[in-house]
Amino acid sequence: MQYKLPLNFVLSFCKDVIPDQGEDSYCYSFCDTAGMLGVFDGCGGAGAKKHDCYSGKTEAYIASRLCSGAFYDSFRRNFPNNMPAEKLAEEIFLPTALQRLKENEPDQDGIRITGSMVRTLPTTAAAALVRKAKGGMLEVSAFWAGDSRVYVLDKTGLAQLTQDDTSVADPMENLYEDGVLKNIFCSDRKVTLHTKTVTLKPPFIVLTATDGCFGYVSTPMEFEGILLHSLLNADNPKQWEQNMQEMIALSAGDDHTMCLAAFGYRGFVAIQRNLSKRYEEILNAYLNPVYALAQEDREGRQALWGKYRSDYMRYLEEKSE
């Protein structure tokens, strides 16, 4: 009998800072043995040009939607599929998205903006592909270009699966330094779609998020705190989704989009029980100490980040055997 994907539920939100002007997008799709979820952040600085052919929308707005549609269609047309993540990136996801962008390049009828940072139809991409593996395990493959992220959340804590394509590599430093994006989807420059694959035993949660979700806290552990606090104060998945969005919106200075999927739990209450101890751990070890620091005490925050970092970076800084 074929082992089916133990999906509990999918949550998503896509919130605009300026109503009806948001440049984020997302997608998700599932079959019996695989699932894909992703977020896409149209780059409003590099893609600020507006065009009549886009009904006055920016290239960033259009790019994120073209790219999310390309990933969605790629999954629907090609899965189930056992191809390695690297080949999926090179032969399916990347060329399909680039073709969509190229086919929809605008006529130059809009306001012309020039400069070395300007791109045609620029957007980030961060997608997670979850597939069944042997022995009841699940294979999680992250695909990304830019600074949107894929995470895994389990009782060990939150962990980043993607490495930001910016000039500042450290997640803590990235909150304080304005790193330059080095690699994004666009129709006029070379793009690299990175991959990272891990094999995990359920239960766990996979989430994809644009930088508006995690980029306006003072430390990475505060983002985990938002996820867990909002979970433990919810009665059902839909309320968790609402709680997360409301907490993120309190500090977000950008559009914020998330798509999340839970795997292998025996109901919503089981998720809360599984992760409640982790919340107590980070509340006592990291969150309460962070909240007690003066706003300007970056050194104190850095010290706490140094203790938290190893678990958070456990998949990006795996030690060789």
Enumerate the predicted regions with their spans.
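C-terminal catalytic subdomain
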Residues: R189-E321
